[in-house]
């Protein structure tokens, strides 16, 4: 319902869409790169501060939220956060989600259910017509209310829960 790039028209200037990516693994990095190529203004967050340079190298802004001590496994995966850290993360992301046109969540913890990061309260604060893509829906989802294989509309925000997005473009996947 909204164009991604900034456009100058005879009727005026259309500002670029704002995209917020949560989780900067392989899927998150691809989401950042794609949104930037399409002309969006992109911000990204991950509990692993070591990915900041990767986010910046793609032209996005890395969102810093002080969660205290966060770690990653030897394989580079994020470790589970405490309840207190999750609350801090949600508080830090609340304003960013509210001002974003698109939120893409990819956060998963190896061997565990995906953390619920986007609360229904955060969804309610988003602008009408905003879209959330929950790419972690197959392991429980990052968004309250997301359902696997469905597009759910909550408070005029569309939440897309699709565990097999590559299957939507089989020729290229």
What are these regions (language model features)?
Residues 1-3, 7, 16, 137, ...:
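Adenosine-phosphate binding glycine-rich loop
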Residues 3-96:
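Glycine-rich phosphate/diphosphate-binding loop of Rossmann-like nucleotide-binding domains
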Residues 54-55, 74, 116, 144, ...:
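Short Asp/Glu-rich motifs
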Residues 38, 57, 97-99, 126-128, ...:
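Short gly/pro-enriched beta-turn/loop segments at secondary-structure junctions
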Residues 73-103, 107-121, 162:
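A structured beta-alpha segment of the ubiquitous adenosine-cofactor-binding alpha/beta core
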Residues 47-49, 67-68, 108-109, 136-140, ...:
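Short, ordered loop/turn segments at secondary-structure junctions
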């Amino acid at each position: 319902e909204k164009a991604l790039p900034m456009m100058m028209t005879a009727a005026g200037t259309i500002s670029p869409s704002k995209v917020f990516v949560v989780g900067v693994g392989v899927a998150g990095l691809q989401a950042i790169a794609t949104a930037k190529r399409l002309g969006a203004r992109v911000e990204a967050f991950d509990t692993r501060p070591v990915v900041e340079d990767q986010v910046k190298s793609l032209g996005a802004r890395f969102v810093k939220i002080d969660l205290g001590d966060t770690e990653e496994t030897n394989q580079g995966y994020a470790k589970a956060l405490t309840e207190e850290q999750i609350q801090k993360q949600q508080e830090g992301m609340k304003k960013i989600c509210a001002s974003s046109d698109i939120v893409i969540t990819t956060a998963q913890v190896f061997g565990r259910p995906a953390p619920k990061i986007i609360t229904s309260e955060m969804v309610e604060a988003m602008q009408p017509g905003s879209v959330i893509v929950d790419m972690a829906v197959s392991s429980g989802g990052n968004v309250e209310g997301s359902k696997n294989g469905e597009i759910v509309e909550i408070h005029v925000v569309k939440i897309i829960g699709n565990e097999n997005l590559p299957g939507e473009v089989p020729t290229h996947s």
